[in-house]
Every structure is written in C-alpha cells, then in structure tokens.
C-alpha cells in the first residue's frame, strides 16, 4: 500500500502546488480519469460524453475541427473556417481574421506533403500535428481527450465558482500554462480562450464548465448554430406576422 507521502499533491517548498490544487479523489468521481479518451469528451458530470453528439469515429480534436468542414470532405479551407465562425455567431470582422490566422498557421503541419498550398487547407486526419504549446494539455499529442487535465482547468483556476471561470481566471489559466520561449503558443492560447469567453460567457461574465467541455468535442459549436437558427426562424416568423 502506498505511503501518505507518495500520494501527496502539494509540497510546502513549492507554494504553487498549494495554490493550484488537483482533485486527489478524481477516480472516485470518474472512471479512469487519467485514461485519454479517443472518441468522447468526458468529465465528472458527463462520464459518457455529450448526450446526442455523434463522434463519427473521429478523435475529439478532429471533432473540434470538423465543425468547420462544411462539406464534410475532410479538408477545412479558410472560407469554411469563416462560415464556421459565422455559424456560431461571430461577426464578420472576427470571422475574417479568425479564418486567416487559423488556416495560415495550422495548414502546413497538416499537409500530406512538403509543398505549401496557396489555399491553406487544414487536413482533419492530420490535425494532431498542428497542436501548439502552452495549452491546457486536455488534448494529448494524438488528439485524444484527457479528462484529468480538463478537470484541472477548474480545480486549479476556478476560485469564484468551482464550475465556472471568470475572464481574469481564464487569463490566469493561460499564464499558468505558458511554456518557456513559446510566444506563438502564448498568443494562441489567449486567443482561443478569449473567443470562448466571447461566445459562451453567461450573464454574470463566467464561462460554465459545460461550455468549456463542449468546445473540445465541438458540441458547443453545434449547439450555438442550432440556437441561432431557431432564433432567426422565430424572428422571421414574427416579422411575417407583423
């Protein structure tokens, strides 16, 4: 049987381990939390993943990207990324710059060959090659979802509410995850979490845990798109009645 010291998650000489705590009993709340999940994004509230979300035999990282693959051919072009941004509710300016940044920086690592493409396509089957540093490590290097790392986002950073993150807590999250000499990773992480905050914050200015989890498997994007369509249909119906 392991000694108490061998199971300690804090060290007195390393105050950061006390400030940013982990859940020592996570395996009581979620089966095999350190096992990377290839197909579903699970947490303590959703041990089977997102209800109704179809994984299509894709990795969780691939599912995240596949939302923007509007014609389902396995390749995401800049104009598809733009349409994906628009589908979830971002304005034209954010959508335009978002598609440029994402496709310019992520295209080349996913290409099947060495010659760059002027169309900046992102190949979904190779998206794991485009994983940047200074991230939360919720995706492993093959694009699987690591539940323990996802839970750490909240145990380490959610100081106001255990299942929500404020803007300042999201900022601190990106600061805590910084790797040395990785400016591109620092910027990418902040942009990603800023976009999530803009998209999913509640009326009190917090990002719920469920929204954060939904980003990783793309189910949040699907929810936002469906919600916008319902809202647009309702407005259109009311307009006709008037």
Curated annotation (Swiss-Prot):
| Residues that coordinate or bind Ca(2+) | 71, 73, 80
Q: Name the top EC class.
A: oxidoreductase
One GO BP annotation here?
A: negative regulation of lipid storage
Per the UniProt entry, the Enzyme Commission number(s) are 1.11.2.3
Task: Report the co-factor binding details.
Answer: Binds 1 heme b (iron(II)-protoporphyrin IX) group.
Q: What does this protein do?
A: Calcium-binding peroxygenase involved in the degradation of storage lipid in oil bodies.
Query: What is the name of the protein in this document?
Result: Peroxygenase
